[in-house]
Curated annotation (Swiss-Prot):
Reactions listed under catalytic activity: Hydrolysis of Ala-|-Gly bond in repressor LexA
GO process annotations (BP): DNA repair; DNA replication; negative regulation of DNA-templated transcription; proteolysis; SOS response
SUPFAM superfamilies in the cross-refs: LexA/Signal peptidase (SSF51306), Winged helix' DNA-binding domain (SSF46785)
Keyword Hydrolase applies: yes
Site (Cleavage): 98-99
Name the UniProt record assigns to this protein: LexA repressor
Function description: Represses a number of genes involved in the response to DNA damage (SOS response), including recA and lexA. In the presence of single-stranded DNA, RecA interacts with LexA causing an autocatalytic cleavage which disrupts the DNA-binding part of LexA, leading to derepression of the SOS regulon and eventually DNA repair.
Assembly and binders: Homodimer.
Active-site feature positions: 133, 170
Source organism of this protein record: Burkholderia multivorans (strain ATCC 17616 / 249)
């Protein structure tokens, strides 16, 4: 791997940890807050330096458009699409009616063409986030969460799940006797789900985020 300065290594490691933990990279503002930079512009300068050294690639116009490139320290290797290749067409899911599939036609408000390089792996749909329970993970009301359909998830991953009649976005942690759905906002309570509960169904994992207004 190209030799980095101590500060550049801190930024690179922060990006790597964020992708390992949640499936998508941090925003410039999150990098600045975590590492004590005076502004997101300072984070941008370090990101551009890392891009010049060939260890990351930046996608213009996306707050989380950061991809780790190859190397022993990169947990994911992203392949950027060549110009002219077809983008992903992803359905946008709005409100989900109780008891019906998330991807039921009546839930899909529109489709978006998205650069596949924005995501840690290929998503199946975009879910419009409602509320601020995941605020401290950088997921805000109105954001579009890229979701890959899964029936299993690892500890620490951000998931989309059905809980009774509701669809929720939380961080999953296994506990004795069940799982805990962790809110990333102290104003919201975590939710414990007993093992085998008929009220719980995993719908997918987060593989990226598009800030409201970026599409």
């Amino acid at each position: 791997m190209t030799k980095l300065t101590a500060r550049q290594q801190q930024v690179f490691d922060l990006i790597r940890r964020a992708i390992e933990r949640s499936g998508f990279p941090p925003t410039r503002a999150e990098i600045a807050a975590e590492l004590g930079f005076s502004s997101p512009n300072a984070a941008e300068e370090h990101l551009r330096a890392l891009a010049r050294k060939g260890v990351i690639e930046l996608a213009a116009g996306a707050s989380r458009g950061i991809r780790l490139l190859g190397g022993d320290d990169a947990p994911h290797q992203f392949t950027l699409p060549h110009a002219g290749l077809m983008q992903l067409s992803l359905p946008l899911v709005g409100r989900v009616a109780a008891g019906s599939p998330i991807l039921a036609q009546e839930h899909i408000s529109q489709h978006f063409a998205c650069d596949p390089a924005l995501f840690s792996s290929k998503p199946d749909y975009l879910l419009k986030v409602r509320g601020l329970s995941m605020r401290d993970a950088g997921i805000l009301d109105g954001d579009l969460l890229a979701v890959q359909k899964r029936t299993e998830a690892k500890d620490g991953q951000i998931i989309v799940a059905r809980l009774g009649d509701d669809v929720t976005v939380k961080r999953l942690m296994r506990r004795p006797g069940g799982i805990e759905l962790i809110a990333e906002n102290p104003d919201y309570e975590n939710i414990f789900v007993k093992a085998g509960s008929a009220d719980f169904a995993l719908e997918g994992i987060a593989v990226g985020l598009i800030r409201s207004g970026e599409l």
